[in-house]
Amino acid sequence: MIKKRIAASVIVKSNKVVQSISYKKFLPIGSIEPVVENLDRWGVDEIIIFDIDRSKNNLGPNYDLIKAISSIPISTPLAYAGGINNYKDAINVISSGSERVILDNLLFKNSKNIKKI
């Protein structure tokens, strides 16, 4: 039997966790640290950080945010999405502390990068 896994999605806008309503309206939730700590404490299998400002504004990944999250003493694997435009970004995201990367725009912009990752 396949084990069910629970992945928690955390939407980040301007370095704050937000609740998204159809990606048009955003309600502030607060700082990312207590959110990540609570998700780890509740036993989720993976925490996915969606940094929605990064791709939209062509800013590249938020390495400071990834390092800050990875410095929190949690045991839950972390995945990151946002601003990953090439394979070097993906490698740097993993080097900054994320265990996985989530690709979206890169698939449409330059699918050859996927093989390099």
For every predicted segment, state its role.
Residues 82, 104-106:
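Short beta->alpha connector loops at strand-helix junctions that form conserved
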Residues 108-117:
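Short histidine
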Residues 45, 99, 104:
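Short acidic/polar active-site loop segments enriched in Thr and Asp
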Residues 1-76, 84-88, 96, 109:
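Conserved N-terminal beta1-alpha1 strand-loop-helix module at the mouth
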